[in-house]
Amino acid sequence: HCLPLESIALFLVCLADEERKDDDNTKTIRGKNVSAKIFGRSGKIMIVRVDDDEDDTKDTVDRVSDKKDNVDDRRDNDDREESIDKKDTVDKKNPIDDKDDKDDKDDVDNDNDKDDDFRDDDEDLLSFELDELKEVDADGDEVDDKHSVDSFDDVEFQLSHVRTASRFKGLAVISVNLSTHLQNNKANVGIMVYLFLEPGSVTFGNETFNVKAGTVKFNIEVNNWDFCEGSSPACSSRKEGKFLDLTMKIKSKDSPTEVEDDDRKKAVCNDKDDDNDDDDVDDDDDDDDDDDCPIIYSMGGDSEMLLNRGVMLDDDEYTAMPVGFPKLEIEDETRKFVFRIPKFSKRALVDPSVTPGERTPKLAISAGTWLQLNFLVTVLVQIAVMFVFH
């Protein structure tokens, strides 16, 4: 007996749909041609450029056009971010699905996820993951092993809902927040992920730079870190903590190399200098000076990463990192960026961003094409069986 064609087709459709679902503690955000997948375990972020299609374009237009909301979401780590439009409706059958009126036929978690976009063997894949936090003294030596986080591999982050109609510095973005509490250190770590849907200019302290549609920014925030004070009995070495080293593991097509080409820098960095002065010093009260330009790294495949030279401390006080930071380290073929954060009392904010380049052309079969091919093969087999028995 032959299996009915309807059953075979239904089975294949079920397989395709199952591959599109996220796990409970992952979120996928998707723009016109860039997707980012965020993992609650370790806070890992995977970024790829994907092929555009008609449905994705419509979905992105829906997100960009929804700009009526101006309510400040004070629960967010970033008070500059605006919440989703109040017209959005929640699917009662799938509470995690936050849908807008124009998006009622999306997949279960409203993330347009295609799991085959994110493969570890994809050479064009970019990934970023917190590696460790380490308190160091003025000489860069570790203060106390209790004042460190050796690995984030087993750290669980809580993920917010995906906000498809957010704004950052006046630009349309899709965003999701991660947060966790470090029990041993009694500190909080948050990651705010933004996928830009339109190009524009962003300022971070003294640094101004351009973003594109498809740029992904992920602010990393550390709150309430208790630094050693030298005489504190809680610190066994009695050293004084002066900096907090934040290390981030990365995966990229090529080993990151700093961009020195002036033309490429001009495409990224803006300045506010309207006069032809020779003043290269950025004075706080001198609006005629150039803004600093972030460090630009080429990641291979035309992908670029921007690393700010400073951090925001406490009440949005821009503070430069020590000379030589942020810096690239390579250990046993593992690539890492190290950010040396000056001592703070409340919070510290690091602000890296990345723009993925074009994907390397390769032969790939989508789930829809795979289904059509299997259906065609099944029909041909059925016809062949009919001829054999007749």
From Swiss-Prot:
Endpoints of the signal sequence: 1-16
Residues passing through the membrane, by range: 369-389
Positions of region (Disordered): 53-121, 254-292
Annotated compartments: Membrane
Basic and acidic residues bias locations: 58-99, 254-271
Topological domain ranges for the Extracellular compartment: 17-368
CC per GO annotation: membrane
Tissues of expression: Component of the acid-insoluble and acid-soluble organic matrix of the aragonitic skeleton (at protein level).
Swiss-Prot/TrEMBL keywords: Membrane, Signal, Transmembrane, Transmembrane helix
Side of membrane Cytoplasmic, spans: 390
Compositionally biased intervals (Acidic residues): 100-121, 272-292
Protein topology in the membrane: Single-pass membrane protein
UniProt protein name: Skeletal aspartic acid-rich protein 2
Species of provenance: Acropora millepora
